[in-house]
Curated annotation (Swiss-Prot):
One Pfam entry name: Guanylate_kin
Organism: Nitrosococcus oceani (strain ATCC 19707 / BCRC 17464 / JCM 30415 / NCIMB 11848 / C-107)
Name by which UniProt lists this protein: Guanylate kinase
SUPFAM superfamilies per the UniProt record, alphabetical: P-loop containing nucleoside triphosphate hydrolases
GO molecular function: ATP binding; guanylate kinase activity
Gene3D superfamilies (UniProt xref): Guanylate Kinase phosphate binding domain, P-loop containing nucleotide triphosphate hydrolases
Family: Belongs to the guanylate kinase family.
Amino acid sequence: MSGSLFIVAAPSGAGKTSLVKALAASMADIRLSISHTTRPPRPGEQDGMDYHFVTEAIFETMEGGGGFLEHAQVFGHRYGTAKESVLPLLAQGMDVILEIDWQGRRQVQAQFPHCVSIFILPPSRETLEHRLRLRGQDTEAVVARRMGDACAEISHYNEFDYLVVNDDFEVAHTDLRAIVQSRRLLRLRQEKRLKSLLGELLE
């Protein structure tokens, strides 16, 4: 039985990472794919837990060998989702979450037309700016650049299947769970899981 592929994207400051981690921790048979990146680890990040931290040479070898479902360059660093991190899980019937941007969604959807894409929105522009300012002692120019990048990401919201507003964390988390559960209840997926029951009922 094949699992479902979920893509979750959001502007920086929308709370995407916390939401997808909570989703993966609260539901059975769903995993969060861990991306490869060439950027150095930030304080508190662990290799193999937050990202697979690799050199440019390793990344290029993987890319050249067709090892990525999607890859992109962001602020001078490279990010990619390895096929080996996703395909075996799907084949086992596990659902997989990809935490990527709109560009990555386009690449993945070209290969998996039936994947489910979700975009996380902040509740307001003011809240988004406030969250971005909380990330560090940045200059006004840096905050303005981050806001510009966030708005550019948001402009692609209409390429996604679902929109979830992260104002109240628990409400947004419940919304994400509902999307996953609705996918699991689709007839085509349930037919496989309930094959013996259906056979018995239709004898």
